[in-house]
Amino acid sequence: MRSASPKDSQSATASNDSKLDLEITEARNDSHPGMASMLRPGTNTGGVITSEEYMTEDEKKVQDLKDFGYHKFRWSSLWQPAEINPLNGKSYTFPIFRMTDAYSTAFWLATIGFFVAFLSWFAFSPLMPEAVKADLKLTNPQVTHANMASLGGTAIVRLIAGPACDRFGPRKVMAALLILGAIPSGLAALVTSAGGLYAVRFFISILGATFVTCQAWCSTFYDKSVVGTANAFSGGWGNMGGGVTIAAMIGLFERYRAAGYSPHLSWRLCFPTMPVPCLLLVAGMILLFGKDHPAGKWSQRHQFSGTAVAIAQGEKIELDASERAEYERRAADREKGPAKAANFRAADPADAGKRVATVDTAQSEPITFKRLLVILADPRVWMCIMCYLLTFGLETAMDAALPGLLFTLFQSNTFSAIDAAYAASLYGLLNLYARPLGGVVSDLLFSKYGLRGRVIWLLVTAFSQGIAMIGLGVYCNRDPQFSGVMWFIFLIGTTGFLANGANYGIPAIICPSAIGTVSGLVGAGGNVGGLLYLGIFLAKPGVKKAKTLGTKFWIAGVVNSGAVLPFFALLIPGKFSVL
């Protein structure tokens, strides 16, 4: 037998290189990347597995920028097909106007689900001052207790919804929350006492946990370079449901009154005719048109090549029962699965310094007690929790307090309780631009300064909200004018909602394999913050004649700013820095 000549060996090597080039090109150009098994085991796909001989110097520079979180924005990316990270299937771009794209569909369903949930969750607030309070003969403390019940329930459910998202996927969890929340929303019409009101509002607050599913769903579909923008737009526009419900529920109540129904019956008819149908309709849309993950089913989420890269880098991948069953089924068809580390070669020593970041390879995994302890030991997680506690917590408290404040300060023949509620609704509508802007700026800073940029932006905006609250409190204790109060409300809303948007881009980076769990912790913090602020408002209600109505606001502002300050220490280089 003739031995292989050096020329034959070189020819075979060149042929193999050509095949590898073709496989990599096809994978990168695939608008809907498939599973890792598309590539031959050991094929270079990126990061530690990538061989630099396939990239020019310019391509390497661009790739380095992308690895750091930069992806050049183009207006056309809003309607063109999503550009996909082949490692994890997430989109580098934000194609919200390409409705047939799975990434756009996930964004809009998450947003609409969040919107109708908040519309229903806050549906009692606009009817409370005039209709519900009078009909049930409630005292002011009872109204406050009802508001606190609606916040406490959400905090509990958010802690449960987070791990559920990591285990079952955010799509299924969101649909379940909407369906469950529709039940007490319909039963609201049967309330006849303060105790019944507390119970109904507690169970309606299940809907507040959709914040967790919204964030987890968007984080599942969008890459680190754009996740802040995607989450902020979804969170901001979805949260507007809390502002829209004021106009919607009051308008519906007035329609029933004009049709001849009594106030006793009018407010009760509002719940089964608006929130309930909206919740059930959107839940059906999510189940019919939604997608669990870019890979398809939630049990298929580890089938992107990033899992293979993570295994090659020595990371341990936890598979749940449904995933193991999926891999066993696929293994029967072909012996190519990312769960088998032996199929993937180890990294070359020369590439050891270019390990792929965990944020690019991680997929959500069921939470364990050990991993939970690791998460709770991370000061960056507590920073996110505290900032959301202070910002979203204030939002929920202000949604309940502002109508009463404006009515008490400016009540007249031309300014009724309904007028005060409409004016207060402008606070929630600031979410239209402020939260999205907070996320966009966060992504821009991340592209230039990394996680440090995101954190600075979050801390500055959260601290500024506290300063604005102090200003409102001092102003209301003097001789306030309507325009002046509204300007302070604008400042408080803008700074607070910017901080919310800034917060949304951080959990997916610091804990990429437990996005749901961290989002649940952060979201629960927001509800605890609402209880904190409502407690301050209840302890210091204030009196108009004594010019003490603003005291509770400046106290809340001092608490806000003081609680943010310690986290600036995370930015100091040295032993205690975590950035």
Feature locations, PLM:
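Glycine-rich segments within core transmembrane alpha-helices of 12-TM secondary carriers
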Residues: 228-254, 278, 431, 522-533
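Extracytoplasmic gate region of multi-pass secondary transporters
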Residues: 124-126, 373-438, 500
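Structural signature of the two symmetry-related core transmembrane helices
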Residues: 172-186, 452-471
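Cytoplasmic helix-loop-helix junction between adjacent transmembrane helices
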Residues: 200-239
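Symmetry-related core transmembrane helices of the 12-TM Major Facilitator Superfamily/SLC fold
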Residues: 265-287, 550-570
